[in-house]
Design a protein with these regions (language model features):
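FNR/FR-type flavoprotein reductase catalytic core
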Residues: 68-215
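Glycine-rich dinucleotide-binding loop and its adjacent helix/turn
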Residues: 455-474, 532-552, 576-638, 745-760
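Feature captures the FAD/FMN-dependent oxidoreductase FAD-binding
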Residues: 474, 479-483, 531-581, 679-692, ...
């Protein structure tokens, strides 16, 4: 799809590639960049777009081979295809008629400077270009730059070409000769730093384009954060261009060295292999797969017979003979007396070292049927009211009790797109199970989540037909789009497909699944489970498009022009939240989004992956939610000697599921509650070494109903840490909200919707984190289902 059609070599390590990417070529403006992946194991690397040809549908990238991923790219040839190209990303360069403008480019920074110089010249500016490099071979695109410049100066460190000297000397000569109104500088961070020191002295406004560490490139991970004017900014969404006089270059340089040891080791291994081969090295052999819950179940579980057809159970009601007979087979007191099932778990001493072995092992047939027999099949089931997607819980539970396991799965899928997912990660104890009638007698509720997982897993592992999981599709109605493939988007897609719509899901990342893939570790939610649910949607008719950012690659207006009658925005979590305390941008401090994305989506802990994994001996995770538990438990599995959760309230107020806290503690996680970070202490290299903590006490309840934490004056302590993972929530993804004119926004940048999930733009509906600011999987799914129902009604009314 992203085929290389031209390659040029400027120097031993600098290459130009022209790549087919028609949508990006059409949308690209000066200043934009893309994220590129060479192969399935490749790192996501940011590259600024040098040129674009809308007619040919191509973009031009200039690359310097410095690490494994860029060396892999350098070894690709015309005709080869890149695995992924995502963009255009970032903000376009603000172009005005400034007057006299100096464009200063160093090394490969000349490539992204070219379209800026072209745009400045077209806007009527006098453009003076200063190109700089260590030697002549690093002066690239000179002829192209000369065409758009009124004057061009070449500087080389060694004097091998042009004038001998640094880029700042060339700029200084221009400043001495005439008045300069603006400066644009792109190149190595050190170069830009000294250019800005010079121009600040002369009070010349200066824009710099920053190329920082990135993972996703859409703002979700926070790896690209920099300090600008004393505030934390995200290069991929707020930049890449900033006021150079406000940038903390020293901090940026420290952060860019975050993975230098890992990168040097990886490059050494790559070069060692390459020196002994005529072609780039093949990836190492796959390690033997760990035993998954699927292989264990398939090895020991047999398929019980289902004497009654699934259709009878699926289409029935509480008053059907089979359910009446089931209810009378045991007295209510007998059902209430059965103890709640305990699911088998991997032993803590084993699972704490297994990143991809699922902790909860599932129920056996006997366990599932016995647990299902605890359900009283209530006439007015509170559990259904507690379910955000309104699953007919008694119905599917009774199907399990009677041995109709396939029917149980079909009952689930009639209202839920992701039953195998929800059965694993949804907080049933706060939703359906919290409304169970068992609570009235003081006994434990029916294990609805365990049973939901059992039914979905059983159907997946014992398929009776190719379309067993595919719900019946309604009469063809129209064409709708979904932005994002997380739980809200998938739920919407499944529901609309059932109702007869042609559904296309646009996903920014290279994997479908959103937070289900990048955010939740496999020891809680195996990828195979998510992939099966996605495949079920594909088989039902849902189309998926990866590497496409609605609002960047393609606009809402363009979707409407292509015949999409409605758009559901489920773009999910955007910018990770940070506390804004001293030292927070130090090396070794990451957001949970970045940490989990590296490990889960990019498989950074694998020898096959080019993405470096953040590792620490003493890991501190700040926060008390499920994402914090996922992060701290992952850190243990990657070899941390100590893993500590720091939370400002008590354990009672923790939003994480009780089960997740229990599992974390069993695995050796330490909990330091009623403490809050106030400062990070670093070494001379800028790497975090300690967390300074303020001891807290609980005061009166706040708006959330939880008691407000208050600092205890003078109670300060320190905790050793060489890796800190900040997990204190997220802000909505800003790309779509900022890309749609006239779209009404809510508090903190969420999309404002009415009770029907409809925004101020009638064709645009929204749900999940982009509306709530933060939601569980099942709440997001509930939004998706509700939005689908309402959009269907709205579209039907429009058509009469």
């Amino acid at each position: 799809m992203y085929r290389i059609i031209r390659k040029e070599q400027f120097s031993p390590r600098v290459f130009l590639f022209e790549v087919e990417a028609p949508l990006i070529a059409k949308a690209r403006k000066a200043g934009h960049f893309v994220i590129v992946r060479t192969d399935p194991h490749g790192e996501r690397i940011p590259l600024t777009i040098s040129q674009a040809d809308k007619q040919r549908g191509t973009i031009t990238l200039v690359v310097q081979a410095v690490g494994v991923s860029t060396n892999k790219l350098a070894h690709m040839e015309v005709g080869d295809e890149l695995a992924d190209v995502v963009g255009p990303l970032g903000k376009a360069t603000p172009i005005e008629r400034f007057g006299t403008v100096v464009c200063a480019g160093g090394g490969v920074g000349i490539a992204p400077l070219l379209p800026i110089a072209q745009a400045l010249k077209a806007a009527g500016n006098r453009v003076i270009t200063v190109l700089a490099g260590r030697s002549r071979e690093l002066i690239i695109l000179e002829d192209e730059m000369r065409k758009v410049s009124d004057e061009l100066i070449v500087m080389t460190d060694d004097g091998s070409y042009g004038r001998k000297g640094l880029v700042t000397e060339g700029i200084a000569s221009v400043i001495e000769a005439e008045k300069v109104d603006r400066c644009f500088a792109i190149g190595p961070a050190v170069m830009m730093k000294f250019v800005c020191l010079l121009t600040k002295k002369h009070e010349i406004p200066t824009d710099v384009s920053l190329n920082t560490i990135m993972v996703d490139g859409t703002g979700m991970c926070g790896a690209c954060r920099v300090t600008v004017g004393g505030q934390t900014r995200f290069v991929c969404v707020d930049g890449p261009e900033f006021d150079g006089h406000q940038v903390d270059f020293d901090e940026m340089l420290q952060r860019m060295r975050a993975f230098k040891p890992e990168e040097e080791e990886a490059m050494s291994d790559y070069q060692h292999h390459f020196d002994h081969l005529d072609t780039p090295p093949a990836p190492p052999a796959e390690a033997a797969p760990v035993q998954t819950v699927e292989s264990r179940v398939e090895a020991v579980e047999t398929t019980p017979s289902e004497s009654d057809p699934a259709a009878e159970a699926l289409n029935g009601s509480r008053d059907d003979a089979w359910r009446k007979a089931l209810r009378t087979s045991l007295k209510p007191k007998e059902r209430m007396a059965i103890p709640r099932v305990e699911m088998e778990e991997l032993a803590p001493e084993i699972r704490a070292h297994e990143l991809r072995m699922e902790v909860n092992r599932g129920l056996s047939v006997e366990q599932a049927q016995r647990e299902a027999s605890r359900c009283l099949d209530c006439a007015n089931p509170g559990c259904v009211n507690g379910c955000p997607v309104k699953i007919d819980i008694p119905h599917f539970v009774k199907c399990i009790e009677s041995g109709r396991f396939q029917a149980a799965n079909q009952v689930l899928r009639a209202t839920s797109t992701l039953p195998a997912v929800c059965g694993r990660v949804c907080p049933q104890e706060k939703q359906c199970e919290s409304q169970c009638i068992h609570h009235k007698t003081g006994s434990a509720p029916v294990a609805v989540g365990y049973l939901e997982r059992f039914a979905a897993d059983y159907a997946r592992l014992h398929p009776v037909a190719a379309s067993a999981d595919v719900p019946e599709r309604g009469e063809a109605k129209g064409k709708v789009a979904v932005v994002g493939s997380g739980p809200a988007g998938l739920s919407f897609a499944g529901t609309m497909c059932q109702r007869g719509y042609d559904v296309t899901v646009f996903e920014a990342l290279h994997e479908i699944g959103g937070v289900l893939k990048y955010g939740i570790p496999e020891f809680r939610l195996p990828n195979a489970v998510v992939d099966h649910e996605i495949q079920t949607l594909r088989e039902s008719g849902v189309r998926f498009v990866k590497d496409c950012i609605v609002g960047k690659t393609i606009s809402i207006e363009a979707l409407e022009q292509e015949g999409y009658e409605g758009v559901f925005v489920a773009s999910g979590a955007g910018l990770p939240n940070f506390m804004g305390i001293p030292g927070e941008n130090a090396t070794g401090i990451l957001s949970s989004n970045e940490y989990l994305t590296r490990v889960n989506l990019m498989d950074a802990s694998s020898a096959l992956s080019d993405t470096p994994a953040p590792e620490g001996r003493h890991v501190v995770v700040v926060g008390g939610g499920n994402t914090a538990m996922d992060s701290v438990r992952t850190a243990l599995r990657l070899g941390a000697e100590t893993a500590t959760v720091v939370y400002r309230r008590s354990e009672t107020e923790m939003p994480a599921r009780v089960e997740e806290v229990k599992h974390a503690r069993e695995e050796g996680v330490r909990f330091l509650t009623l403490h809050n970070p106030v400062r990070y202490i670093t070494d001379e290299a800028g790497h975090v070494r300690q967390v300074e903590l303020q001891e807290m006490r609980l005061g009166e309840p706040d708006a959330s109903g939880r008691r407000r934490p208050e600092p205890i004056e003078g109670a300060i302590t320190r905790l050793d840490a060489d890796l800190v993972i900040v997990s204190i929530g997220v802000s909505p993804n800003p790309i779509v909200p900022h890309a749609v004119k006239g779209l009404e926004l809510g508090r903190k940048g969420t999309i404002a919707v009415d009770d029907h999930m409809q925004s101020s733009i009638p064709m645009l509906f929204a749900g999940g984190d982009i509306v709530r600011g933060g939601a569980t999987v099942i709440l997001a799914m509930g939004d998706g289902k509700r939005a689908a129902e309402c959009m269907d009604e709205w579209l039907s009314e429009r058509k009469g």
